[in-house]
Every structure is written in C-alpha cells, then in structure tokens.
C-alpha cells in the first residue's frame, strides 16, 4: 500500500506540507512551474494556510491531470517534531479518506526538517494514515461498508529510496498492529471469548513463526493458577492462559515479559457493577489486545530481542459457583489472597500471569491492564497511569511511550501502600484495601508478584477507549500501548 518513488507521475491526488515562511523548491517548484505559478499565487493570496494542522483543498486546472491537491499546514519549522508530523499526516489523511480518494501521492520532502529526517517522516506518514482511516467493524444487517477505500500511497522524495521505504514499512507495521488491537477491543464479549482470543493468538503465532502455548483449565489446576481459576469460577466459558514466545537472539536471555489482562467481559462478579458501569466492559481485555498488537508489530519487524507474551484470559461472571467476597485463594506463586471485592479481578489474573512469565525466563516485566476507575479520576482519559519497582527500567518504558505519542505518568508505591495490601487476618494479601488510592493499591498488589524483577505496571482504564473521534480515528478502542510496547522491544537495553 505504501511505496517510495523519485518520480511524480501526474497523480490525481497530491498531498503537500507547508511550513510557515517556506519557499517552493524541489518537487513543489517543479509542480508550480507545471501549474504556471498557480501555487505561488495561492500562497500569496492566502488561499492555502501554513498554520499547524490546517488542511486546504485546491482544485487544479484540468490540463494538469490532477483532480485535487491537499495542503497541510506544518507551522513553524523550528517548533516541528516527529509527533507533530504524525498529527499533520493524520489530519490530512482523515480528509482524504472522507473524500474517498483511492490513490494518493505525498511530496514527502515537504514534511522533512532538521528534527524530522525523511525516514521518520515516512514512518509518520504510513502509521498516521492507517490510524486515521481506521473504521469500526459493525454487525448491522446492512453494514456501512465503504464503497471506495484508500488503495495506495506514494511517498515522492529526492532522499534515499531504501531508507524512505524502510520508514514506510515500519510505520505501516505500527499502524496495522494498533488497528488490530482496536478491532479486538471493539468486538462484543459474546463474539470474543477467551477461546476466541486464544485462537486469534494462535493464528498470529502461525503467521509470524512464534512459539505458542495455550494452557487449558486442567493444566492450570495442575499448576495451581488459583487467581485465574477463581475469576473463571462463575463462567461457562473455559479460561485460557495464552503464551507467545518470540526469540530474536541466539540465547533465551534478557527476556522482555509482556503481560496483558484478558478479561473478555467483566460484570464485577458478586461485587456487581452498576448498570451505567457495566456497559462497555467488553473492553476489559484492552491489555491483552495491546500485547497482541505489539506482538504483531514485533512479528513484522523482527527485532533482535527476546519477548515472552503472557495473557491470562476469562470473563468475570456470576453463578452459584462464582468467587465470593471473603473467599481465600492460592495464587500460582503460592501466596494466598483474601477476596474483599470480586470486581478487583484483573489483578488476580495478572498475579498468575506475572508469576508464569517469571517462571519462564522474563528478565523484565510490563503488565498492561484496564484495571481501575481510580486512574481515570487521577489522570483523566489521555494519560496512562504507571507504577514501577525499578527507576531505570521505568525510564526506558517512559521514553518508549513518549516516542509513541502515548503519554504515561508515574504514580508512587510507598511502603505504607504495600502494608495496606498485606493487611489481612486470613491470607498473605487482600485484593482491595479500599477506595483511597485505588489505582495505587492495584499496582501495589501486582508488585507483590513482580517482587525483585524490574517491572512497570500500565493502567490503561482511561486510555483504552475514546468517547469521541480524533484525527487518529473514530470513537471506540484506541489500541493504546501496542506501539509503546513495540518501541520498548526495539529499544530495550538490559541492565548489566
């Protein structure tokens, strides 16, 4: 879909970036000459704007063979960043998509600056294009299928074509992996059970030659996965422990463990959610989707790293067999847990997932979960909450999140917080000390299972879905953290 060329071959649709106070040169000067100075006149008359994110549409003379030119304002070049490049491309391709254009050429060099080289601009182009044109799959009798879809995007450049094509390929992998995560999260709970999620993971493994292991209920019972099994007790659907292994090094060492919460629907159990809180709980497997989206990106790019993805999956339902408040369960680690809140189930399955990842060689751990409403109260819907037991590893995750445009904010875990989750007369831990510092309590609980392994917890309860459309796509699932995990995998430096 995305390809690089050093030739501008009379495209019907053209995209051009404009910096403030910039002059026409290269392909833009060549194009202006073909248009008899029409672009120069448009700029002079103010009919196109270089203001950041402003899209201007121009209808060139029929003799040129072009039907439409889209100008996107880039603002001041001195203030222009990689993240700005992605947003500008998203905005212009959102307009291109609305206009049902199928073949587009982009004058890539007009998006290049000292801070954004051609390969990075190419990455931003393909990633943002795929995110911007994504549409939610519906299940209507007469589905609103687009009659025309974007088929090809040509990045026209005078820079090194191999580097530009490589950038396009990387960006396309990131965009597609994120969109795959979005699609999983948007699926209804009756169409995406733990079994369905496991089948999806197995197909991903077959496509990218990952090792794949799907642990069944009897195997979990034999191993003693009391956290995942307890949450599953109320369900008629069997649980699955999904394990994907990517080995990019000769030796299985310096392994990045990615653990994603895979609760395919969450009623809250006997601590049942209110009617306004239960709708939308199909998205409670957002962490699992992020991990699978990241694994798709990893499969495409094949970094020289080792990755272990672990996804404990079930739904959290109510029945005569379901887990109850006051129950005491035994986790895979051997630690016992008093259940004070059956709606604090995500941390129970993550406890077993983290322990399993450690047992199978994870050197560092990142868990991703739609875990608490408390993180939304604290940080809103645009910032992911983060907690850690290791400052240096956290910095690597934070840098990856920044590069991906998926901001995170660290919340503290103090010794007093740890004491609160250890406060139980009946067990080693309790799963819900109270509402105060709720997001932190959840992180502190999970940290009891990470123990001394470098670990970062990402609570995406506020960022996994968006209530309204943005330039990066429609309302619904965002696929958040798929890109961050993939960047972390590419950039990870083990501590020696």
Swiss-Prot record:
Cellular component per GO, a single term: cytoplasm
GO biological process: proteolysis
Alphabetized GO MF terms: manganese ion binding; metalloaminopeptidase activity
Xref: CDD domains: Peptidase_M17
Comment on bound cofactor: Binds 2 manganese ions per subunit.
EC category name: hydrolase
SUPFAM superfamilies assigned to the protein according to its UniProt record, in alphabetical order: Macro domain-like, Zn-dependent exopeptidases
Keyword Transmembrane helix annotated: no
Catalytic residues in the record: 273, 347
Recorded family membership: Belongs to the peptidase M17 family.
Function (record text): Presumably involved in the processing and regular turnover of intracellular proteins. Catalyzes the removal of unsubstituted N-terminal amino acids from various peptides.
Protein name: Probable cytosol aminopeptidase
Organism: Bacillus velezensis (strain DSM 23117 / BGSC 10A6 / LMG 26770 / FZB42) (Bacillus amyloliquefaciens subsp. plantarum)
């Amino acid at each position: 879909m995305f390809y690089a060329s050093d030739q501008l071959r009379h495209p019907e649709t053209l995209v051009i970036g404009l910096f403030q106070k910039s002059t026409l040169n290269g392909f833009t000067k060549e194009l202006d000459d073909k248009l008899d100075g029409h672009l120069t006149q448009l700029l002079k008359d103010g009919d196109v704007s270089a203001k950041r994110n402003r899209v201007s549409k121009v209808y060139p003379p029929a003799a040129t063979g072009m039907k439409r030119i889209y100008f996107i304002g880039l603002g001041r070049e001195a203030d222009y960043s990689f993240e700005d490049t992605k947003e500008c491309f998203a905005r212009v391709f959102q307009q291109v998509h609305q206009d049902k254009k199928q073949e587009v050429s982009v004058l890539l060099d007009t998006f290049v600056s000292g801070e954004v080289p051609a390969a990075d601009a190419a990455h931003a182009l393909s990633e943002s294009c795929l995110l911007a044109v994504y549409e939610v799959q519906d299940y209507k009798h007469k589905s609103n299928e687009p009659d025309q879809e974007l088929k090809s995007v040509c990045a026209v450049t005078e820079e090194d074509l191999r580097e530009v094509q490589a950038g396009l390929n990387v960006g396309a992998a990131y965009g597609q992996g994120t969109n795959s995560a979005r699609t999983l999260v948007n699926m209804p709970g009756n169409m995406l059970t733990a079994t369905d999620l496991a089948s999806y993971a197995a197909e991903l493994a077959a496509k990218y030659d990952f090792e794949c292991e799907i642990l069944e209920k009897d195997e979990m019972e034999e191993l003693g996965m009391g956290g995942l099994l307890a949450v599953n007790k109320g369900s008629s659907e069997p649980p699955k422990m999904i394990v994907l292994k990517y080995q990019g090094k000769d030796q299985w060492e310096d392994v990045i463990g990615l653990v994603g919460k895979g609760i395919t629907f969450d009623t809250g159990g006997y601590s049942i959610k209110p009617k306004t809180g239960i709708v939308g709980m199909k998205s409670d497997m957002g962490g699992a989707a992020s991990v699978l989206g990241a694994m798709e990106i990893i499969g495409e790019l094949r970094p020289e790293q080792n990755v272990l993805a672990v996804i404990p999956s079930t739904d959290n339902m109510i029945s005569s067999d379901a887990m109850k408040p006051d129950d005491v369960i035994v986790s895979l680690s051997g630690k016992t847990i008093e259940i004070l809140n059956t709606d604090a189930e995500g941390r129970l399955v993550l406890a077993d997932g983290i322990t399993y990842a450690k047992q199978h060689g994870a050197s560092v751990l990142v868990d991703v979960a739609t875990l608490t409403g408390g993180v939304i109260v604290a940080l809103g819907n645009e910032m992911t909450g983060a907690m850690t037991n290791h400052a240096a590893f956290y910095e690597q995750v934070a840098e990856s999140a920044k590069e991906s445009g998926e901001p995170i904010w660290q919340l503290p875990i103090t010794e007093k917080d740890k004491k609160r989750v250890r406060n139980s007369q009946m067990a080693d831990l309790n799963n819900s000390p109270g509402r105060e510092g709720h997001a932190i309590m959840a992180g502190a609980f999970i940290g009891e299972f990470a123990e001394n392994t470098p670990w970062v917890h990402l609570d995406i309860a506020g960022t996994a879905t968006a209530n309204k459309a943005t330039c990066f796509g429609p309302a619904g699932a965002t696929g958040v953290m798929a890109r961050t995990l993939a960047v972390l995998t590419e950039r990870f430096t083990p501590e020696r």
